Structures are given as C-alpha cells and as structure tokens.
Amino acid sequence: MESAKGKLGVMCVGLGAVTTTFMTGVLMARKGLAKPVGSMTQYDKIRVGRGKDKKYLHYGEIVPLTSLDDIVFGAWDVYPANAYESALNAEVLKDRDIEPVRDELKAIVPMKAAFDRNYAKRLDGDNVKDCKTRWDMVEALREDIRRFKAENNCDRIVVIWAASTEIYVPVDEEVHGTLAALEAAMKANDTEHVAPSMCYAYAALAEGAPFIMGAPNTTVDIPAMWEMAEKTKMPIAGKDFKTGQTLVKSGFAPIIGTRCLGLSGWFSTNILGNRDGLVLDEPANFHTKEVSKLSTLESILVPEEQPDLYTDYYHKVRINYYPPRNDNKEGWDNIDIFGWMGYPMQIKINFLCRDSILAAPLLLDLVLLSDLAARKGRYGTQRFLSFFLKSPMHDYTQGEVPINHLFQQYVMLKNAIREMGGYEADEEID
C-alpha cells in the first residue's frame, strides 16, 4: 500500500452549508478546539483477532489514513462567497465555532462552477464557467484540478460532490452504456443526457482522483463511468449521503424484518429550509431524491422472501421546503406494522436533526477511505462505503441487488478495513 504521507487535496463541488461545516470542523479539530464526533475514521474501533489475540483498534491503527493536518481544501461553487462568508450565511455553526479558523476559511475561495441552470433551476449564482459544450466543462475542470494540485503541493486529490441535487436523468443505454458513447455525447453537447455532475466525475477520474457522489444524481452509477474508473484505476463511490431519516430507516427496518413482523406501510416526510430544501422544492429535482430515498426498503423487507409479511406495503416519501427551519431538518416516520394473527400496530419516529452536522463526518470518512482505497490499488465501485450512502451503487446490469441493511453494511465496512490492514474478514458484529 502506498504511504498516507504528503498533502491530500480535498476538492468539494459546492461550498454551502454541508461543505463549510465539514471544513470548519476539520480546521477546528486540527487546533484541538472541536471534536470530530460522528466520524467513524476518528472514533470507531474494529476488533481484530480472536480469543487471547483479540484487540480493538481504531481504523488508523489498522490502515494508514491521511492525517487531518495534511488536508488541503478547495471548492467550486456557483456563488463567489469564500468559505468564511458561506459558513456565516449558512447559519449552521455559531460564530464562536467559526472565528478561530476565520483566516483559513477566508483563504478558500471557490473556483467557477461547471453549471447548467436547467439542472438546478432554483439556483441563480453567476460564478460559473463559460463553456460551449460538456466536453469544454470537462477540460476546464481538469485544468482546475491540475492547477489546484500544483499550487498547493498536493500529493493526491479526492473530489467529492456536496452540491445540490440535479434533476432526474434516467439511464440511457445508448449514451451511458459505454465510455466511448458518453465521451461522444459530451463532445456533441448532449445536455439532456450528460449532467454537469458527470463532467466533474469524468474530470476527477481523468486526473487520477477518486470521485464521491454525495447527492442522488445520476453520475457515477452508469456503466460508462464504471468503465472510466476501471480505465483510470480509480475508486468511485455513491450515492447520496445517508444522514437522517434514511439512516434511521436502514437501521430500523432490519428490526422489523429480524422479528418477522409484517409491514403495511411506511410514510416519511421532512421539513427542511436550507439551500438543499430550496432546490428540492422543484419537482424535477425532488424526483431524483425521491427515487433514492424510496430504494432503501426494497432490499431489506423483500416481498419475494416473505410474501405474507411484505407484499404490497405502501411506501411514500415527501420533503417540504420550510425556510424557518433552515438547516435544522425534522423528519417524521409513521410505520404501520402487524403482528400475531395480523393485528395492527404503529411506530412513530420524530427525528429533529441538524442536516449538515450529520453530513460533515460522512464527508470526512468518505474522503479518507476513498484515498485509502486508491493507495491500496482498489478501483471501481467501492461497495464497502455503502454504510455512508442512501442509495448504494451496484451493477444493476447484472441483476445485482444493493445492500441497504445498515448492519450488513457495517460488516462490509469493517471487513474491508480488516483486509486492507492484513487481517482476516469476520462476519460477527461486536
């Protein structure tokens, strides 16, 4: 495995609430002024060995992870505000938690974004590249990555999407089925089938950087990008950060399934007032998120495996834009279940959470573990990162079923760390 020493450039697509919360937290942690609570790479321990040889180790004691001190931040955004201004505007963190790293945040000025307003109609920023074709976007982004890497003396780069959800792009086999077809579509400026996010992913992989899709966009979950990842020998991960309601769902649905209780319906609704909520208020963008959030139950409570329990259950997801809440998302779940002799029961879950506070540690873990995977020589879809994602990538062309079960995902994560560290895989959870 290649060394974790040297600078790691973390280039974020989007410099809004999630990204600035992530950056501020890392910068504060470096100064010993805050703790990166929620980060698996910083807190979780994995058992290695058995019996008298058993011990519990942090991830960084099993595999070489990049130090927080070696991270260098960069970003693209449609708005020109620097990270300090953006963090204040987001109103996620208190001023007292931003001011100690004010100078570092001010130095993070977003590059012009590769942006198509048709993909996010509620955004009106003008800090955008003037590109005639999607291929021009790719070339401009590649130049950004090369320049950032050189100017900051970075040894490695990871690119992560933390920007808004794009409109839904159905997978088109003719365009998305092969790398050659996708490249041709980019050069022909096929704006219907080639989303801006695909340009970021292509540019990252072409420049030898892993790419992580943190939104539910159709981006790296297409055969053309799998081919690109294999060609460049780079890891890809996606999609959609699993922060609040879906985290609860992927952890609670296994309780219903393990106990062999039946499900009649699961209704989920949210209120959210940040920029993400604004974009999702557009029906075409919400549909992208809806598809992602609806996919969670399908592989956990499977009708074909338990027809008496899970046939024809009703599953509905809604997100409502409500500005007074800003980043403080609230999720309600009403779960109608049935038990012995078919008698009905209900479960109610009310999760008052902070969207960016839950997302920030996911960005850190996904960045560090994607960099680890690249240094280990792993490439293509990194299924072990499914733990952090709402809609885990899978090869649907071969009938592969995604793993959404939180505890199965946790076993996958730990075993990947064990194996990369030279230890044996283990199916037990402890």
Question: What is the predicted function of each stretch?
Answer:
Residues 243, 308-313, 423-430:
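Short, highly charged low-complexity linear segments
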